[in-house]
Amino acid sequence: MSVWAIGDLQGCYDITQRLLEKINFDPAQDTLWFCGDLVNRGGQSLETLRLVHSLRAHSVVVLGNHDLSLLAIGARSEEEQRKVNPDLLRIVLAKDRDALLDWLRMQKLAHVDRALGWMMIHAGLAPKWTTQMAEKHAREVEQQLQGGGYRKLLRNMYGDQPGWSPGLIGYDRSRAIINLFTRMRYCTPRGRIATDDKGTPGTQAQGLYPWFEVPGRVERDLKIVCGHWSALGLTITQGVHAIDTGAVWGGKLTALQLDTDELRVVQVPGREVTGPAPVARAPRRPRERLGRQRSRGNRGNAGNTAVPAKPPVDTPQD
């Protein structure tokens, strides 16, 4: 039996199939861990979602920002749904859409296997979160997402603010937790996410750190595997194994074997693309950037009273 973690698929069905063939995946005895962002941008999102759904008895999935965006689209009116890009439109118009979206909504924000010694998330963790705290906060949002009020959560999850604080309540709290698990790249030592910085370490504004290198962060008792940050490439440091290697942008799709002491990585070439991947923005002056974030954050700590950002039609917050 082998346990494999796989990076962001993003609707790259053919590439996913090639990777499964290369690792000799046997559903009778192997298990797959998918790091989120199953859909969007790759052109084969419906096929990819159906594939992972068909493997549900032999796999674990954590939700990424693109997956949550798809769920939000699925909860909107038919008129709004028809405005999305063709890749996602095929899902919301599919005959099996309800089965696919209902299953997707039941997936986790964090998966932990203490016997194996691993935690899987999509993006990142707050600097002061232990793995136990992360599990607890993930379960909070999962219960909302899996409950009868999930549509209201999906309408209120958009927005960069507030930053995480243990005292947050209502949808402000849920939004902050979702942003950490699904959008995190850089943050301040206090854990405030910098959503505009998406490039490789060294390009970020002063005072920001990769979430896994923040000074004063807690030591964690599990190894962590994650995706989301394709600009990093394959990165293994500080007990974190980042395996989104940009398959949808012409990079590679990566699998990491988790049930072995040896580092075993298997990759296949990603999608052929005609245009460049998104270019990281030049860093702005830290005083301006962090000052604006603090002022916005101070307005957002009032539980359900904060006005959520208007959700985009089909583009998830990155």
UniProtKB/Swiss-Prot annotation:
<dbReference type="InterPro" id="IPR004843">
    <property type="entry name" value="Calcineurin-like_PHP_ApaH"/>
</dbReference>
<dbReference type="GO" id="GO:0008803">
    <property type="term" value="F:bis(5'-nucleosyl)-tetraphosphatase (symmetrical) activity"/>
</dbReference>
<feature type="region of interest" description="Disordered">
    <location>
        <begin position="269"/>
        <end position="318"/>
    </location>
</feature>
<comment type="similarity">
    <text>Belongs to the Ap4A hydrolase family.</text>
</comment>
<feature type="compositionally biased region" description="Pro residues">
    <location>
        <begin position="309"/>
        <end position="318"/>
    </location>
</feature>
<dbReference type="InterPro" id="IPR029052">
    <property type="entry name" value="Metallo-depent_PP-like"/>
</dbReference>
<keyword id="KW-0378">Hydrolase</keyword>
<comment type="function">
    <text>Hydrolyzes diadenosine 5',5'''-P1,P4-tetraphosphate to yield ADP.</text>
</comment>
<protein>
    <recommendedName>
        <fullName>Bis(5'-nucleosyl)-tetraphosphatase, symmetrical</fullName>
        <ecNumber>3.6.1.41</ecNumber>
    </recommendedName>
</protein>
<dbReference type="InterPro" id="IPR006186">
    <property type="entry name" value="Ser/Thr-sp_prot-phosphatase"/>
</dbReference>
<dbReference type="Pfam" id="PF00149">
    <property type="entry name" value="Metallophos"/>
</dbReference>
<dbReference type="InterPro" id="IPR004617">
    <property type="entry name" value="ApaH"/>
</dbReference>
<feature type="compositionally biased region" description="Basic residues">
    <location>
        <begin position="282"/>
        <end position="297"/>
    </location>
</feature>
